[in-house]
Swiss-Prot record:
Residue numbers annotated as active site: H117 (pros-phosphohistidine intermediate)
List of residues binding ATP: K11, F59, R87, T93, R104, N114
Reaction(s) catalysed by this chain's protein: a 2'-deoxyribonucleoside 5'-diphosphate + ATP = a 2'-deoxyribonucleoside 5'-triphosphate + ADP; a ribonucleoside 5'-diphosphate + ATP = a ribonucleoside 5'-triphosphate + ADP
InterPro entries: NDK-like_dom, NDK-like_dom_sf, Nucleoside_diP_kinase
Name recorded for this polypeptide: Nucleoside diphosphate kinase
Cited NCBIfam families: PRK00668.1
Top-level taxonomic group: Bacteria
Family according to the record: Belongs to the NDK family.
Gene, per the UniProt record: ndk
Keywords from the UniProt entry: ATP-binding, Cytoplasm, Kinase, Magnesium, Metal-binding, Nucleotide metabolism, Nucleotide-binding, Phosphoprotein, Transferase
Subcellular location: Cytoplasm
Amino acid sequence: MANERTLSIIKPDAVAGNNIGAIYDRFEKSGLKIVAAKMMQLDDEKAGGFYAEHAERPFYNDLKSFMMSGPVLVSVLEGENAIAKHREIMGATNPKDAAEGTIRADFASSIDENAVHGSDSAESAAREISYFFNEEEVCARTR
């Protein structure tokens, strides 16, 4: 089993719903450690850059607009198999398909406003973490 880091974003809908604490509680209870976090308001440049791989997709502008609609909480999570564990805790992208007890089943209202983002691979995690954090902002937790 590999100790990994993954990027997590609590999206504007979940922030507005005051679900940050409940979502963080699920991360920590699953064994993931929060090693970096910042609340931020994404602008067009930051949201567009983060989702650049989707620029040609029909949902791109709506996605950017949603991600700029309110503050987000961007975090780095660390732990054994953090990427897969985080994705399991999040649940399916569409909350209608998400398993009971997952973040999206409990806190998301639609496929568009689905509460959280998580890296889907080690490569994506490295790219996404470095997009929002510099090395000094990520603090290893040894105890």
